[in-house]
Amino acid sequence: MEYIYASLLLHSAGKEITEDAVKAVLSAAGVEVEDARVKALVAALEGVDIEEAIEKAAMPVAAAAAPAAAPAEEPKEEKKEEKKEEDTTAAAAAGLGALFG
């Protein structure tokens, strides 16, 4: 993630995203730089409109946040699921006991 953050920092500062620039940002942050990862990142970002990518990534988050109101029945459903999980765990434990006699 640090490599992507470094490229985003360079982009927001209006700097060109080059191998040397990414290495400099990572080194300044105290990150041990791997040349292969830097080269792969710079190559992957060639021709990518970072602003457009950020906008596309932010859109689903905003859309997903809209349905915040939840019905009051959801906690009851969760309790049923928890009971099923407990039953499954108990059955698994019983099965393991049969293995060891």
Curated annotation (Swiss-Prot):
The annotated regions of Basic and acidic residues compositional bias extend over: 73-87
Q: Which GO terms describe its cellular component?
A: ribonucleoprotein complex; ribosome
Q: Which residues form a coiled coil?
A: none
Q: Which GO terms describe its molecular function?
A: structural constituent of ribosome
Give the record's keywords alphabetically. Answer: Ribonucleoprotein, Ribosomal protein
Q: Which GO terms describe its biological process?
A: translational elongation
InterPro entries hit by this protein: P1/P2_N_sf, Ribosomal_P1/P2, Ribosomal_P1_arc
Question: Which segments carry the region annotation Disordered?
Answer: 65-89
Q: How does it assemble?
A: Part of the 50S ribosomal subunit. Homodimer, it forms part of the ribosomal stalk which helps the ribosome interact with GTP-bound translation factors. Forms a heptameric uL10/P0(P1)2(P1)2(P1)2 complex, where uL10/P0 forms an elongated spine to which the P1 dimers bind in a sequential fashion.
Q: What does this protein do?
A: Forms part of the ribosomal stalk, playing a central role in the interaction of the ribosome with GTP-bound translation factors.
The entry assigns this protein to a family as follows:
Belongs to the eukaryotic ribosomal protein P1/P2 family.
- According to UniProt, the name of this protein is Large ribosomal subunit protein P1
What is the originating organism of this protein?
Methanothermococcus thermolithotrophicus
What taxonomic lineage is listed for the species of origin?
A: Archaea, Methanobacteriati, Methanobacteriota, Methanomada group, Methanococci
